[in-house]
């Protein structure tokens, strides 16, 4: 299936390209939206091509405001049977411990609220913290999370603009992968700007007659 034709998105001084190759599956994913988390990071969310027909069945015809305010819409993005990739690029320096402990705090809250937090999730959290233990993220460096529908979370690091071809670690826990993404774009996610960008971009794509024609999409942002 071809990727929908989308433009790059510009957030502050950072540019997210229209498509990237996942380090988990090596599939090409399209840029669904991008925004920032206050002054700390900028976030780009990429989706597998099949995401568009998958969400269109229920959400085609909705405008950006309706999607932005819809908890079920973002739950479908988080839990849908298609690959998702989130690229988190640093605006200020953070250590791996600083970053991972805050992410874990948010993810544990999400998983416990769902009533599905078990020993498997606790073990996955420990693995997640270990991956970040000795890392340092200067401004411009990125963390890539590839969430595969079969239940794995691939984590990769990059000091450059490109997404690495392979991940540093793979954690096989479906709930953790979903919680990481939900902590960014869910109802109480850290980046309302990314949530809004996804809603605007996907609404335009779903409501176009031919989302694969590059003339149909011309959306940029300076969130």
UniProtKB/Swiss-Prot annotation:
It catalyses: a chalcone = a flavanone. Pathway: Secondary metabolite biosynthesis; flavonoid biosynthesis. The keyword Repeat does not apply. Part of the biosynthetic pathway for all classes of flavonoids, a large class of secondary plant metabolites, many of which are brightly colored. Catalyzes the intramolecular cyclization of bicyclic chalcones into tricyclic (S)-flavanones. Responsible for the isomerization of 4,2',4',6'-tetrahydroxychalcone (also termed chalcone) into naringenin. Keywords: Flavonoid biosynthesis, Isomerase. Substrate binds at residues 41, 106, 183. GO terms for biological process: flavonoid biosynthetic process. Belongs to the chalcone isomerase family. Its EC number is 5.5.1.6. This is Chalcone--flavanone isomerase 2. It is an enzyme of class 5 (isomerase). One of its GO terms (molecular function) is chalcone isomerase activity. The gene is CHI2. Coiled coil: none annotated. The record marks 99 as: Important for catalytic activity. The keyword Lipid metabolism does not apply. The lineage of its organism: Eukaryota, Viridiplantae, Streptophyta, Embryophyta, Tracheophyta. It comes from the Eukaryota.
């Amino acid at each position: 299936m071809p990727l929908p034709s989308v433009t790059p998105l510009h957030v502050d001084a950072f540019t997210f390209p229209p498509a990237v190759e996942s380090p988990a599956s090596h599939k090409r994913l399209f840029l669904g939206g991008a925004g920032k988390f206050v002054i700390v990071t900028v976030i780009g969310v990429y989706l597998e091509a099949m995401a568009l027909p998958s969400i269109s069945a229920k959400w085609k015809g909705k405008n950006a405001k309706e999607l932005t305010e819809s908890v079920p819409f973002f739950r479908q993005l988080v839990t849908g049977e298609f690959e998702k990739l989130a690229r988190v690029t640093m605006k200020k320096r953070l250590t791996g411990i600083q970053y991972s402990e805050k992410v874990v705090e948010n993810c544990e809250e999400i998983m416990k609220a769902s009533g599905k937090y078990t020993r498997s999730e606790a073990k996955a959290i420990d693995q997640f913290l270990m991956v970040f233990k000795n890392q340092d993220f200067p401004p411009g460096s990125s963390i890539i999370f590839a969430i595969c529908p079969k239940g794995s979370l691939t984590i990769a690091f990059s000091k450059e603009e490109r997404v690495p071809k392979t991940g540093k670690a793979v954690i096989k826990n479906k709930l953790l992968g979903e919680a990481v993404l939900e902590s960014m774009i869910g109802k109480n996610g850290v980046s309302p700007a990314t949530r809004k960008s996804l809603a605007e971009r996907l609404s335009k794509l779903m409501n176009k007659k031919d989302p694969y024609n590059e003339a149909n999409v011309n959306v940029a942002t300076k969130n």
